[in-house]
Amino acid sequence: MTSIEELRVLPPLAVGRLGAAVEPMDNYTAETDPDQPLAPRRLRPAPTFRVDRTSGAITGVETPGELRFTDGQGKVRPVAPFLEVWALTDDHVLRPLTLDLLRLNGLTPGDVRWRVRVGNHKIQRRTYDDRDRIDADTEWFSDHAAHALNGLCPNFLEGRSLPLGHARYLQPTPGFPGVRLRFTPAGGHVYGSAYTDRPTDPDPNVVDFLYDATKGTWRGHADQAGDPRLTIPAQIYAGDDGPNGSWVSRGYLDDECDGLVHVKLEVSGRELTAFGRIGAGPPAYAPDSVPIRTVADELDQALSGPRATAGDTLEQARAVAEEVLRRATETVRLMNTEVMNGNTVDGRVDAASTMVRQDTADTGRLFEPIMAPSLVDTAAVLALHQNVLAALRSGTAPWFADVLRDHDEVGDLTAKGRRKMPALMRGADGRSLALTRRQVDLVRLAARQAIFRQDTDDPEVPR
Amino acid sequence: MPELFEDQAPAVAALSVAGSLGAEEKRPVLPPEFNWRDYTVMLLHVAAEIEHSLMVQYLFAAYSMGGPQVPEARRDDVRRWQEVVLGIAKEEMGHLVTVQNLLTALGAPVNLDREDYPWGSDFYPFPFTLRPFSATSLAAYVVAESPETWSGPKADEIKRVAFESTGQYVNRVGALYSRVDAILKDEEFLPDESFHAGTLPYQASWDEWGRGYTRGERGQDSGNVPDVKSPELLVFGVFSRDSARRALHEIGEQGEAPDADLEDETSHFNRFLGIYEELTAWPEGDQALVSRPVAQNPVTEHRLDESEVAALGVAEVTTSPITDPVTALWGHLFNLRYRMLLTDISHAFRLAGPVDNGGVLTGRGALVHRAFAEMYNLRALAGRLVDLPLERDAPDGPRAGPPFEMPYSLELPHHDHDRWLLQRDLVQASRLLTDQLLSTDPSCGGDPYLVALRESDQRALEQVEHILSRKGCTR
């Protein structure tokens, strides 16, 4: 039997990326070059759905000959993820929801109903004014038109809304019979705040004025020192120096968002529902690099717990250790380590927003570089990471578990604590970044185990 | 044993100078051909070689530990011990660079040399021997690091085992340091102006060399293995008589804890002793399985396989030639990277670090990082060598192990430009070896480590070429 019992939206979390080009970004993979294992990952074009703009149907699958991240006119191509509906049928199999499966249950694509709700609450997070919340809601729909995600906000200028992209229920066809929704993020623009009781100077940074700076407080807002509700660190918005060391907001808005994709289907008198999460972030300007701690790592930890489990093989643990090092190498490649370390730059002390500034501001401690200033020449640090990665590929046990920062060491401001890895980087709480507990534990597992191996050992034996 | 203290007139050659710790109230006597400053420098040269050779022997022992033959129930212990021995070796590296700092502060050249076979000088604890980890080799380390006050039945027993395993009474490392201290503390021997504070920017600092290991924070868990404390890397800058004495005192204490309670777990002596007691409590059958079947003193040169009798009537030192052709290539690669490590350290001492917050950087930081990278390479290569056959056509015979052979010279060219030429030579030599390994042996074709090493050498070559092409590189 193939009676539909439950629904799922897969992937459960999809991250889009902003871009103003009309055509979304093609699919690609990032692979390690076996002949140059220390080099950045190579991007390889991958099979990509082509969607007919008129009908909303997938017309084919193409693997592009080359990858282009812009449309050639200076506009970035957005990453527009597909969300698929899967069904758990009465034989306990999770399978894609298709035209056939719908038909077997006496349903058509028109019976599938969608609703997308996204928001951008960045202003409200800082002003604590609920009228600064920006929300968009498509309401329920079953058609295949593009549904604009228009962000509405009580403190906007009359009749204005923030474009947050659009969602489209793709029309299933015999060739591509799956039930899918595509989320296309917004263009990646900066919007401004205008006064209604006085003239507003033009601003070359903004494409339009949306926010009513007379009605709301966002333009001219300054975080109040000592307020326990502040973001950590505070003052992370576009602004200018104000009186008494304050940081005064210019009233800018971006068009990022995140929210929920709901799907609903009535089967044999029962209403089945499911939802997935979507978000839109800035474009990937280093698409051949992976951050050292990703959402995927968080999900892995949520799924498997903070420790290595009995099911984790030594080989997996070693792979995690190597991946951590690879990402660290990719990250160093993108950093100006001399500046990030708090070295004097062209005679300037405190030349940028760094963990050194953070440590100094939070504790009143002396502005003190993190690593020995002689050690942070960017080329030398990059070479060091590449060398560690090379040595790790020999199969020797990772030896650097010692210097990984534990989750409960993020506030350790001793020299040893500040120098732990990942170094020079900030976590979400304004203190030094740490890997997930599970990442650290897997590296330690590999560190403990690897000396008993022999090259002939079967690598995939669970512990 | 003749002594160069005033109550015993000097009767023998200069190097026969082992004093005892209890001799603090005695005044050292100057041997012929020296003044006090030069004599101090000579003793520090010996100290550097001792620290260097202990470090290498401990590393060899640590690398030999483990292997598939270790019983499952024993693995946690073996991995823990290995971490302890590696930690002690790392601390010896700290001692080694601190001795270089002392030499630098006195205006003397650094010394990264190491006596190869044969072995002789009565300050050296025991004949230099690369041996797989075992209860008998461990006994020698316990005695070498022991405080003068260590006695009793247990001490006698371990000293007996050490004697049998080395063929001589094992000298205590501490004896040399107390001799140096007896000179340092006396203004008549070395006036204050002998200590050049201006050399500090050239000296190794903990901030550069400590790599996140503890500094004076005992008792932090190491992250690699549960219940093993992080090593405590001591790197002291020397800028005065007091700082010189403190550096030596701390090094001595970390070795043998002369002033500490014998139960103090922080000294090398107590850590080695603890492992010795745990290991000897095992059944003998299990004891024999703690290490891989690694040969003693593996060498890449095709010497005749015969015993060389070392000086001073010590035990015979037997070298084990690596005759398997592929293993020999790995051994040569190991020796070359060892040479690169010593060159990087030595080169780093020739360049000043920034005296402020690094507004202008020299190549020093890059050299320090390269030195650490070579340590990681040595670890990786040793991991290969303890798994590769020593002898041609004996695939199931003894394993090779890392040879740690000294280069023909450690001298650096006078001009910085020419030092970078040497660096380039070494990288190119490594490329030749890796290419040879990758192309000639099917078992190495596509070896992920060799492929990565080749690439990192290529990148290093580009960096060296960049330095050589810069106008800032002086001739």
Predicted regions located by residue number:
Chain B
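Non-heme di-metal
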Residues: 1-475
